[in-house]
């Protein structure tokens, strides 16, 4: 009964944990690394074709984004997640594949002129579509059994529509251990979705620490702030441009604007228009509306029961096609434009910035975190000019930020979550935080609450039955010199072939004991395949 820590160790992104228990091999989360990497991540120590299943906490790419990649390498097992997470992953993984293929096409056009080797995306649309078929929707609070001796319960983590903490109970050799994976723990009193559900019993806890060293402070009045920005901008004849993450944050903005319109907080501008210019955001909003009763909080449900859609209001316009998007720029009325991506590094928001950033009447309102190195970060730090589509654009618009808005619990919320466990767990593993933050939070858990805690590096292996560390890895810093080049398309195809060969061997090993006539037919199929491809001209 072992756990190996793969990703989001001393880093925020790339969540992935590999478990061997009750004769099964499986993952909890399979996330993509995003932003700068500081430490090398251990590869999953098994051929993906040998994995039995995956448990998924939620749909964000840093938790789900590598699922198509392991599918491409042979993983064909079920992926258990809440129903809302299954629906969001359907659109988000396809969107991720589209972005990667588009980026590869762009880089290869540029690279061919410079004689550079071909850039290959991590996975294709075919891989994304394939893995989506393997999702198994699970209700909150109901125990499921993905394999004998393994039971799983999803409880609401309050971070994103469908997000969950996972309670995993394993029975092996007459012993039972309960492991809780926090997933991303939500901030209290977020609009629309419920607060996180506390758990009370676990032998081991793997918990996030994104804000493990800081408090969000007093909650601002978001509706008042947004009303003031819109009123002030419209009064001078401008428009409000909101770069926003398509899933989660966009729906929160719609929730706030519905209230602003209902309470007539913006005066003198009639039924002003609000454009949501993001196909992904529009699809996500539809999914939010499909999961009102299982995911919405009491305030949102109260609106629904009155026949009010919390995400709809007069003046709301959605744009799907590129022509729809371009047409917005010809609308000279004062308006609000909500568009992705939230950090302004991709998507239709860049076109809206090109058309609106120069005009001092307009306001660019940031409603989410802006990572170092992004266009959004440059704007909030006071850039006077920026490059957009090869052109220099002067920053004349007012740049504003909505303070304190976060989908993650702060340090106080994290402490309250872990304190809810009645008996102290044997061990708490602190992950999903910046390098120093994981160590700071682990020490705080030990010093203030008396918990046995550690912040493991990628590659650390822990024996859950013996409560002992089998191997404690050390962080290996990434340097530019050690960064491996992207494999060529031919190399990637060969790697996939090798992966399929390894999966075939796995199936062969599992076939021992089946009827002889089936074994004989299986052998003939393999013989025929070998005869077809074992040629001198290959």
Regions found by a protein language model. Give the residues of each.
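His/Asp/Glu-rich metal-coordinating catalytic cores
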Residues: 1-55, 64, 71-252, 256-273
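Short secondary-structure boundary/capping segments
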Residues: 94-99, 103-107, 221-223, 256-261, ...
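A polyampholytic, Gly/Pro-enriched intrinsically disordered region
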Residues: 100-105, 292-306, 387, 470-492
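Short, surface-exposed amphipathic charged segments that create phosphate/polyanion-binding patches used
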Residues: 150-154, 287-295, 415-416, 465-477
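Hard-cation-handling environments
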Residues: 229-374, 386-387, 437-439, 444-447, ...
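C-terminal, active-site-flanking charged/polar segments
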Residues: 359, 434-479
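Generic long, charged, amphipathic alpha-helical segments
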Residues: 387-418
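Charged, amphipathic alpha-helical linkers/stalks
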Residues: 459-518
């Amino acid at each position: 009964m072992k756990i190996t820590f793969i990703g989001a160790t001393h880093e925020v992104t790339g969540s992935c944990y590999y478990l061997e228990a009750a004769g099964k091999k499986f993952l909890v989360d399979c996330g993509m690394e995003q932003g700068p990497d500081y430490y090398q991540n251990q590869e999953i120590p098994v051929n993906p074709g040998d994995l039995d299943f995956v448990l998924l906490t939620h749909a964000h790419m840093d938790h789900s984004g590598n699922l198509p990649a392991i599918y491409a390498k042979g993983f064909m097992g079920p992926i258990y997640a809440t129903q809302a997470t299954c629906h969001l992953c359907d659109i988000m993984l396809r969107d991720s594949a589209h972005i990667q293929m588009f980026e590869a096409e762009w880089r290869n056009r540029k690279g061919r002129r410079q004689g550079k080797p071909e850039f290959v995306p991590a996975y294709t649309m075919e891989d994304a579509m394939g893995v989506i078929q393997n999702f198994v929707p699970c209700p909150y609070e109901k125990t499921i059994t993905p394999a004998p001796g393994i039971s799983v319960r999803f409880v609401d983590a309050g971070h994103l529509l469908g997000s969950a903490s996972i309670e995993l109970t394993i029975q092996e050799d007459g012993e039972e251990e309960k492991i809780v994976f926090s997933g991303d723990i939500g901030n209290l009193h977020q609009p629309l979705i419920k607060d996180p559900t506390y758990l009370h019993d676990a032998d081991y806890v793997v918990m996030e620490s994104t804000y493990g060293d800081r408090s969000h402070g007093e909650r601002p009045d978001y509706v008042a702030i947004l009303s003031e920005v819109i009123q002030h901008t419209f009064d001078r004849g401008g428009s409000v441009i909101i770069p926003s993450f398509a899933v989660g944050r966009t729906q929160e903005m719609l929730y706030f604007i519905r209230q602003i319109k209902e309470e007539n907080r913006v005066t003198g501008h009639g039924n002003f228009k609000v454009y949501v210019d993001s196909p992904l955001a529009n699809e996500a909003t539809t999914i939010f509306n499909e999961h009102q009763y299982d995911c919405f909080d009491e305030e949102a449900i109260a609106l629904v029961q009155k026949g009010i859609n919390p995400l709809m209001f007069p003046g709301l316009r959605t744009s799907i096609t590129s022509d729809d998007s371009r047409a917005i720029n010809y609308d000279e009325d004062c308006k609000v434009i909500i568009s992705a991506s939230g950090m302004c590094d991709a998507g239709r928001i860049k076109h809206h910035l090109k058309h609106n950033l120069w005009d001092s009447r307009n306001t660019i309102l940031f409603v989410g975190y802006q990572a170092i190195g992004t266009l959004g970060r440059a704007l909030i730090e006071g850039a006077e000019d920026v490059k957009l589509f090869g052109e220099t654009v002067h920053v004349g618009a007012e740049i504003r930020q909505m303070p304190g808005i976060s989908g993650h619990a702060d340090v106080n919320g994290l402490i309250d979550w872990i304190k809810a466990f009645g008996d102290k767990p044997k061990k708490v593993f602190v992950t999903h935080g910046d390098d120093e933050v994981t160590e700071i939070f682990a020490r705080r858990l030990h010093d203030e609450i008396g918990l046995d805690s550690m912040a493991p590096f990628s590659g650390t292996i822990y024996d859950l039955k013996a409560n002992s560390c089998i191997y404690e890895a050390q962080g290996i810093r990434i340097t530019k010199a050690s960064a491996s080049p992207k494999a060529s398309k031919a190399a990637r195809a060969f790697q996939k072939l090798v992966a399929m060969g390894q999966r075939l061997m796995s199936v062969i090993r599992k076939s021992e004991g089946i009827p002889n006539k089936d074994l004989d037919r299986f052998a003939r199929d393999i013989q025929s395949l070998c005869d077809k491809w074992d040629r001198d001209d290959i």
